[in-house]
Protein backbone atom coordinates (compact mmCIF):
# COMPACT_ATOMS: atom_id res chain seq x y z
CA UNK A 1 0.00 0.00 0.00
CA UNK A 2 1.15 3.52 -0.76
CA UNK A 3 1.62 6.14 1.94
CA UNK A 4 -1.17 8.10 0.27
CA UNK A 5 -3.59 5.22 0.93
CA UNK A 6 -2.73 5.26 4.62
CA UNK A 7 -3.16 9.03 4.73
CA UNK A 8 -6.58 8.80 3.08
CA UNK A 9 -7.63 6.02 5.44
CA UNK A 10 -6.50 8.11 8.41
CA UNK A 11 -8.51 11.11 7.24
CA UNK A 12 -11.59 8.94 6.75
CA UNK A 13 -11.08 7.38 10.18
CA UNK A 14 -10.87 10.84 11.75
CA UNK A 15 -14.17 11.71 10.08
CA UNK A 16 -15.73 8.48 11.37
CA UNK A 17 -14.47 8.88 14.95
CA UNK A 18 -14.92 12.63 15.38
CA UNK A 19 -16.59 15.79 14.15
CA UNK A 20 -13.41 17.22 12.69
CA UNK A 21 -14.13 18.28 9.09
CA UNK A 22 -12.39 16.41 6.29
CA UNK A 23 -12.32 17.28 2.56
CA UNK A 24 -15.39 15.78 0.82
CA UNK A 25 -13.19 14.66 -2.08
CA UNK A 26 -11.69 11.99 0.18
CA UNK A 27 -15.02 10.18 0.17
CA UNK A 28 -15.60 10.09 -3.58
CA UNK A 29 -16.27 6.47 -4.51
CA UNK A 30 -16.03 5.31 -0.89
CA UNK A 31 -18.70 2.73 0.03
CA UNK A 32 -18.53 3.30 3.78
CA UNK A 33 -17.11 -0.13 4.60
CA UNK A 34 -14.59 -0.16 7.44
CA UNK A 35 -12.91 -3.53 6.92
CA UNK A 36 -9.56 -2.03 5.96
CA UNK A 37 -10.08 1.44 7.40
CA UNK A 38 -9.68 0.30 11.01
CA UNK A 39 -5.93 0.02 10.47
CA UNK A 40 -5.89 3.82 10.66
CA UNK A 41 -7.83 4.08 13.95
CA UNK A 42 -4.71 4.59 16.13
CA UNK A 43 -3.46 7.37 13.83
CA UNK A 44 -6.90 8.96 13.88
CA UNK A 45 -6.94 8.70 17.67
CA UNK A 46 -3.54 10.37 17.80
CA UNK A 47 -4.73 13.31 15.71
CA UNK A 48 -7.98 13.63 17.65
CA UNK A 49 -6.03 13.56 20.92
CA UNK A 50 -3.88 16.53 19.93
CA UNK A 51 -6.87 18.87 20.26
CA UNK A 52 -7.62 18.24 23.97
CA UNK A 53 -3.87 17.99 24.56
CA UNK A 54 -3.46 21.55 23.27
CA UNK A 55 -6.30 22.70 25.53
CA UNK A 56 -4.56 21.09 28.51
CA UNK A 57 -1.23 22.70 27.59
CA UNK A 58 -2.87 26.12 27.24
CA UNK A 59 -4.64 25.92 30.60
CA UNK A 60 -1.58 24.64 32.44
CA UNK A 61 0.42 27.44 30.85
CA UNK A 62 -2.09 29.85 32.38
CA UNK A 63 -1.45 28.18 35.76
CA UNK A 64 -4.87 26.59 36.00
CA UNK A 65 -5.37 23.92 38.65
CA UNK A 66 -4.46 20.52 37.17
CA UNK A 67 -7.87 19.02 37.94
CA UNK A 68 -9.70 21.94 36.32
CA UNK A 69 -7.40 21.76 33.30
CA UNK A 70 -7.97 18.01 33.01
CA UNK A 71 -11.76 18.38 33.15
CA UNK A 72 -11.73 21.08 30.48
CA UNK A 73 -9.46 18.96 28.27
CA UNK A 74 -11.87 16.04 28.56
CA UNK A 75 -14.77 18.35 27.73
CA UNK A 76 -12.92 19.52 24.62
CA UNK A 77 -12.29 15.91 23.66
CA UNK A 78 -15.99 15.11 24.02
CA UNK A 79 -16.85 18.07 21.81
CA UNK A 80 -14.35 16.97 19.17
CA UNK A 81 -15.69 13.41 19.08
CA UNK A 82 -19.32 14.40 19.53
CA UNK A 83 -19.20 12.29 22.72
CA UNK A 84 -19.37 9.26 20.40
CA UNK A 85 -17.61 6.90 22.78
CA UNK A 86 -19.22 8.32 25.91
CA UNK A 87 -22.62 7.69 24.36
CA UNK A 88 -21.65 4.08 23.72
CA UNK A 89 -20.48 3.66 27.30
CA UNK A 90 -23.74 5.05 28.68
CA UNK A 91 -25.93 2.90 26.43
CA UNK A 92 -23.91 -0.23 27.20
CA UNK A 93 -24.09 0.43 30.94
CA UNK A 94 -27.85 0.92 30.74
CA UNK A 95 -28.34 -2.22 28.67
CA UNK A 96 -26.18 -4.52 30.75
CA UNK A 97 -27.22 -3.00 34.05
CA UNK A 98 -30.94 -2.96 33.32
CA UNK A 99 -31.38 -5.96 31.03
CA UNK A 100 -31.97 -9.41 32.48
CA UNK A 101 -31.45 -11.14 29.13
CA UNK A 102 -29.46 -10.57 25.96
CA UNK A 103 -32.55 -9.50 24.04
CA UNK A 104 -33.70 -7.09 26.75
CA UNK A 105 -30.24 -5.57 27.02
CA UNK A 106 -30.11 -4.91 23.27
CA UNK A 107 -33.55 -3.28 23.36
CA UNK A 108 -32.49 -0.99 26.20
CA UNK A 109 -29.25 -0.08 24.41
CA UNK A 110 -31.22 1.00 21.37
CA UNK A 111 -33.21 3.50 23.46
CA UNK A 112 -31.62 6.95 23.11
CA UNK A 113 -32.70 8.00 26.60
CA UNK A 114 -30.10 7.75 29.33
CA UNK A 115 -30.83 5.75 32.47
CA UNK A 116 -29.37 5.48 35.94
CA UNK A 117 -26.59 3.06 34.99
CA UNK A 118 -25.61 5.19 32.01
CA UNK A 119 -25.51 8.39 34.05
CA UNK A 120 -23.37 6.78 36.73
CA UNK A 121 -21.01 5.35 34.09
CA UNK A 122 -20.54 8.78 32.50
CA UNK A 123 -19.92 10.50 35.83
CA UNK A 124 -17.37 7.88 36.84
CA UNK A 125 -15.69 7.99 33.43
CA UNK A 126 -15.11 11.74 33.52
CA UNK A 127 -14.21 11.75 37.22
CA UNK A 128 -11.67 8.93 37.06
CA UNK A 129 -10.04 10.16 33.85
CA UNK A 130 -9.80 13.72 35.15
CA UNK A 131 -8.34 12.58 38.46
CA UNK A 132 -5.79 10.35 36.72
CA UNK A 133 -4.79 13.07 34.27
CA UNK A 134 -4.44 15.60 37.09
CA UNK A 135 -2.26 13.12 39.00
CA UNK A 136 -0.06 12.72 35.93
CA UNK A 137 0.38 16.50 35.77
CA UNK A 138 1.32 16.71 39.45
CA UNK A 139 3.71 13.75 39.49
CA UNK A 140 5.46 14.26 36.14
CA UNK A 141 5.29 17.48 34.14
CA UNK A 142 2.73 19.45 32.14
CA UNK A 143 4.40 18.44 28.87
CA UNK A 144 4.38 14.76 29.80
CA UNK A 145 0.67 14.95 30.63
CA UNK A 146 0.01 16.65 27.31
CA UNK A 147 1.77 13.81 25.46
CA UNK A 148 -0.22 11.23 27.44
CA UNK A 149 -3.53 12.33 25.92
CA UNK A 150 -2.80 11.48 22.25
CA UNK A 151 -0.88 8.36 23.32
CA UNK A 152 -3.85 7.02 25.27
CA UNK A 153 -6.20 8.09 22.46
CA UNK A 154 -4.20 6.00 20.00
CA UNK A 155 -4.10 2.97 22.31
CA UNK A 156 -7.81 3.03 23.08
CA UNK A 157 -8.77 3.34 19.40
CA UNK A 158 -6.52 0.41 18.65
CA UNK A 159 -8.37 -1.60 21.28
CA UNK A 160 -11.63 -0.93 19.44
CA UNK A 161 -10.35 -2.90 16.46
CA UNK A 162 -9.64 -5.97 18.61
CA UNK A 163 -13.11 -5.90 20.16
CA UNK A 164 -14.72 -5.34 16.78
CA UNK A 165 -12.83 -8.05 14.93
CA UNK A 166 -13.08 -10.73 17.61
CA UNK A 167 -16.85 -10.52 18.09
CA UNK A 168 -19.64 -11.05 15.56
CA UNK A 169 -22.36 -8.40 15.27
CA UNK A 170 -24.92 -8.74 18.06
CA UNK A 171 -27.59 -7.39 15.71
CA UNK A 172 -27.72 -8.17 12.00
CA UNK A 173 -29.34 -4.80 11.30
CA UNK A 174 -27.08 -2.77 13.60
CA UNK A 175 -24.84 0.13 12.57
CA UNK A 176 -21.66 -1.80 13.37
CA UNK A 177 -22.84 -4.73 11.25
CA UNK A 178 -23.64 -2.48 8.29
CA UNK A 179 -20.07 -1.16 8.12
CA UNK A 180 -18.55 -4.63 7.85
CA UNK A 181 -16.23 -6.76 9.96
CA UNK A 182 -12.64 -5.49 10.22
CA UNK A 183 -10.02 -7.43 8.31
CA UNK A 184 -7.79 -9.46 10.63
CA UNK A 185 -4.66 -8.05 8.98
CA UNK A 186 -5.98 -4.52 9.47
CA UNK A 187 -6.69 -5.28 13.12
CA UNK A 188 -3.17 -6.60 13.68
CA UNK A 189 -1.70 -3.55 11.96
CA UNK A 190 -3.80 -1.27 14.18
CA UNK A 191 -2.65 -3.00 17.36
CA UNK A 192 1.02 -2.76 16.40
CA UNK A 193 0.61 0.86 15.30
CA UNK A 194 -1.15 1.75 18.55
CA UNK A 195 1.67 0.24 20.58
CA UNK A 196 4.38 2.00 18.57
CA UNK A 197 2.65 5.38 18.73
CA UNK A 198 2.23 5.01 22.49
CA UNK A 199 5.90 4.06 22.85
CA UNK A 200 7.04 7.09 20.86
CA UNK A 201 5.13 9.41 23.19
CA UNK A 202 5.16 7.70 26.58
CA UNK A 203 8.70 6.29 26.77
CA UNK A 204 10.55 9.62 26.30
CA UNK A 205 8.13 11.46 28.59
CA UNK A 206 7.69 8.93 31.39
CA UNK A 207 10.15 6.06 31.00
CA UNK A 208 9.94 2.34 30.29
CA UNK A 209 7.88 1.11 33.25
CA UNK A 210 4.99 3.56 32.73
CA UNK A 211 4.97 2.53 29.07
CA UNK A 212 4.77 -1.16 29.98
CA UNK A 213 2.03 -0.45 32.52
CA UNK A 214 0.04 1.50 29.93
CA UNK A 215 0.31 -1.23 27.30
CA UNK A 216 -0.65 -3.94 29.78
CA UNK A 217 -3.60 -1.92 31.06
CA UNK A 218 -4.95 -1.20 27.59
CA UNK A 219 -4.54 -4.81 26.51
CA UNK A 220 -6.09 -6.26 29.66
CA UNK A 221 -9.01 -3.83 29.61
CA UNK A 222 -9.74 -4.53 25.95
CA UNK A 223 -9.53 -8.29 26.47
CA UNK A 224 -11.72 -8.35 29.59
CA UNK A 225 -14.29 -6.06 28.02
CA UNK A 226 -14.47 -8.26 24.92
CA UNK A 227 -14.86 -11.47 26.94
CA UNK A 228 -17.55 -9.88 29.11
CA UNK A 229 -19.53 -8.55 26.14
CA UNK A 230 -19.28 -11.93 24.42
CA UNK A 231 -20.87 -13.61 27.43
CA UNK A 232 -23.59 -11.01 27.93
CA UNK A 233 -24.51 -10.02 24.36
CA UNK A 234 -22.83 -12.70 22.20
CA UNK A 235 -21.54 -9.98 19.88
CA UNK A 236 -20.56 -6.35 19.44
CA UNK A 237 -22.65 -3.28 18.70
CA UNK A 238 -21.66 0.29 17.97
CA UNK A 239 -22.27 1.02 21.64
CA UNK A 240 -19.93 -1.69 22.88
CA UNK A 241 -17.20 -0.32 20.61
CA UNK A 242 -17.53 3.04 22.35
CA UNK A 243 -17.65 1.41 25.76
CA UNK A 244 -14.46 -0.51 24.99
CA UNK A 245 -12.68 2.70 24.03
CA UNK A 246 -13.76 4.42 27.24
CA UNK A 247 -12.84 1.53 29.50
CA UNK A 248 -9.41 1.20 27.87
CA UNK A 249 -8.82 4.95 28.17
CA UNK A 250 -9.75 4.89 31.86
CA UNK A 251 -7.56 1.86 32.56
CA UNK A 252 -4.58 3.26 30.67
CA UNK A 253 -4.69 6.68 32.34
CA UNK A 254 -5.00 5.05 35.76
CA UNK A 255 -2.09 2.71 35.04
CA UNK A 256 0.04 5.58 33.83
CA UNK A 257 -0.77 7.70 36.88
CA UNK A 258 -0.06 4.79 39.24
CA UNK A 259 3.25 3.88 37.59
CA UNK A 260 4.81 7.30 38.09
Curated annotation (Swiss-Prot):
It is a multi-pass membrane protein. InterPro entries: CobS. Pathway: Cofactor biosynthesis; adenosylcobalamin biosynthesis; adenosylcobalamin from cob(II)yrinate a,c-diamide: step 7/7. The keyword Cell membrane applies. GO terms for cellular component: plasma membrane. The chain crosses the membrane at residues 40-60, 64-84, 117-137, 142-162, 189-209, 210-230. GO terms for biological process: cobalamin biosynthetic process. NCBIfam families: cobS, PRK00235.1-2. This is Adenosylcobinamide-GDP ribazoletransferase. The lineage of its organism: Bacteria, Pseudomonadati, Pseudomonadota, Alphaproteobacteria, Hyphomicrobiales.
Amino acid sequence: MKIKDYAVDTARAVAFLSRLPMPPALFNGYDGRLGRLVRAFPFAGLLIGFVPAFALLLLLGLRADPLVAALVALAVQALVTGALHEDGLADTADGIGGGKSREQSLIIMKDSRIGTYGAIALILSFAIRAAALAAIVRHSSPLAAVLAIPAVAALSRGAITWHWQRLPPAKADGVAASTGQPDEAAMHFALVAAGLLAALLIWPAFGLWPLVASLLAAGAAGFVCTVFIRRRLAGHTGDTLGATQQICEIATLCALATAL
